Amino acid sequence: MANVGLQFQASAGDSDPQSRPLLLLGQLHHLHRVPWSHVRGKLQPRVTEELWQAALSTLNPNPTDSCPLYLNYATVAALPCRVSRHNSPSAAHFITRLVRTCLPPGAHRCIVMVCEQPEVFASACALARAFPLFTHRSGASRRLEKKTVTVEFFLVGQDNGPVEVSTLQCLANATDGVRLAARIVDTPCNEMNTDTFLEEINKVGKELGIIPTIIRDEELKTRGFGGIYGVGKAALHPPALAVLSHTPDGATQTIAWVGKGIVYDTGGLSIKGKTTMPGMKRDCGGAAAVLGAFRAAIKQGFKDNLHAVFCLAENSVGPNATRPDDIHLLYSGKTVEINNTDAEGRLVLADGVSYACKDLGADIILDMATLTGAQGIATGKYHAAVLTNSAEWEAACVKAGRKCGDLVHPLVYCPELHFSEFTSAVADMKNSVADRDNSPSSCAGLFIASHIGFDWPGVWVHLDIAAPVHAGERATGFGVALLLALFGRASEDPLLNLVSPLGCEVDVEEGDVGRDSKRRRLV
């Protein structure tokens, strides 16, 4: 899949499926609305209209189903007819699965995605997840030919006209962002260390005409970034704080996306075991998603100030490693007693959000991280967990997840009951909870929030993506689509405006609305 290029076109044109294999994909009632005249040129002379109709009549999705139309050159596949209220109407996860299993082989292939206009964005991002970029299989190096998959959307429902050129460009940039994030997460630490992650940031900056701000190694210590420095100081490649900033004329507010970029997490001296350490190359998933989303957002035009803050470190073991009982002074000015070196992500993010607040003057701070294993227990493998000081933004995150396919579900936000878990006798707080049975994912997020203050008047959103950052052995690029959708109202792109949840009806208590009115407006 690493040599596969995705192309989004308004019309993929006609071709014999034996020369260009084809997958037609959609919900069954949508597939029945596709006229034979539209698919005839892509299926003839191998498939007749009678065979096409017969294939549709045999499909019985439970939750999905597929039927070959001509050998292994043409297939029609059906998505679930219904989804539950906590799933995406696009059935995005099933799109990825069906493309992986049903798309015929070949150097030049075609996917016809049948859906309604509101599901186009989520469907495209789901398609992208089926084509990872990273591989080191020895056979792959011998297969140098570039393969292409052409994607055509056939729209049904109210807005059933052709897909606009601006939409196709947005889909290309969004899916490039998803695949970029997945590639970074899939790449092992012997290649994707803090130095090479900075190269990725510099590459995106050069493409966008932005010079990144980089603070690293001993300068972090000198300037008071005790969280990032303390986590990464034992590694061969030094830790860093990097920032990409987009500051357009006419901006009315400042947004900061803060990503956890632990390129590898051994656990430090509180070392992980042989079964829990493999896969910890994925601990940079938050920073990877922020990078992919920032690139796409700026390419599509972003009207407000947007800062992407990357907290990069390798949590390693060595003579200079942080020890349990050490006390670090963080950028917020607060001291932290280390009682678990494997609770490192919150330390680097605490510095990151504090920098966003103090130095960048952010009105809205969103941090994204593969923060806790407990997230998978709290909200599962498919839904990220959201923790926020705003009921309105909590509802917006959930709705954005359903619109883009990166699903989200809330955690309990109750600092007055939970923050005492970090009580320390010798410092302002410890870095790990006393009771691991007391909502540990919520507590981990609250640790981060405490470094900007629970009374901070701005909007703070924490997204824990530990479980959905991967599906099996492969990264998903989770978070890119979510950020683009959540902040779509600030985009100049009409498709991102469409998938933005803002302005939607939200189910919040009256008291929550009153508190939210004192916070910053939604973008």
Swiss-Prot record:
InterPro entries: Leucine_aapep/pepB, NPEPL1_N, Peptidase_M17_C. Signal peptide: none annotated. PROSITE patterns: CYTOSOL_AP. It comes from Pongo abelii (Sumatran orangutan). This is Probable aminopeptidase NPEPL1. Probably catalyzes the removal of unsubstituted N-terminal amino acids from various peptides. It is an enzyme of class 3 (hydrolase). Its EC number is 3.4.11.-. SUPFAM superfamilies: Zn-dependent exopeptidases. Belongs to the peptidase M17 family.
